Amino acid sequence: RAPADLVPLGPRTPVYAMDALAEHQQAIDVLILCGGSKDDLPAQGPQLAAMFNTVDSFDTHARIPEYFAAVDEPARANGKTALISIGWDPGMFSINRLYGEALLPDGVTYTFWGKGLSQGHSDAVRRVPGVKAGVQYTLPSPEAIERVRSGARPELSTREKHTRECFVVLAEGADAATVEQAIVGMPNYFADYDTTVNFISEDELRRDHQRMPHGGFVIRSGNTSEPHAQVIEYSLQLESNPEFTASVLVAYARAAYRLNQQGQIGAKTAFDVAPGLLSIKSAGQLREELL
């Protein structure tokens, strides 16, 4: 977006064009990259890691190893530190999956997402003929979560772990039954899930579905001995997915600067960052107040 189109929250916040970024290398301690994982970050991540310490939220899980390698080379060559795939998944959920495996090696890890608004699935709903507007939420199955929490280590199918719920505004003259069948039978999006379609008014959509909540659970179910089942659980309930992700990025920006000052250069992930580096408090304060 053009700088003139942006309205900062505060009058003292400067806004510059992307083309002018290189002129500010001496003034920026850490650059937080907020671009998308599909098209923006694969190009921007390596390019900007050659000039700045960076933090990003690249979240295409299957491509993280190749993205790490692409960012690591320019960052290392220029003495910069680049924290990649920072957020809540990947990020906070990743850390808790690691903790679960390390602490309970005899076990199974389960990740549930939601309740949350899915932007990609919402877009798919809006492309169905007869749909004027709509959103889609991913909901974790309470029954599946309770089975996991019991320590039983169930094998769960995609349909058993999550359901999907759509809120749709019909276009004028559209047939509700036809639209519903087009949605619930859509391959790669809804056909493999139990999907509920709710038809609502435009006013209801504006009133009730403008925020971007999300969240989920990471649960490790395992045994430390045959008779003793153990369950580790980490959960998030977020009213604003982007605001929470931003909070995580800012905390890790603090760590990126500190790592760079220690001479730890190149690409890093959440697995490489000691928790104390995230805090504004000194190591002594943390030992006294939180340990």
Predicted regions and their residues:
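C-terminal substrate-binding/catalytic lobe of Rossmann-fold NAD(P)-dependent oxidoreductases
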Residues: 1-22, 117-253
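Oxidoreductase and adenylate-handling cofactor-binding alpha/beta cores
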Residues: 92-108, 123-133, 255
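Rossmann-fold NAD(P)-binding glycine/threonine-rich loop
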Residues: 58-84
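NAD(P)-dependent Rossmann-like dehydrogenase/reductase catalytic/cofactor-binding core
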Residues: 230-291
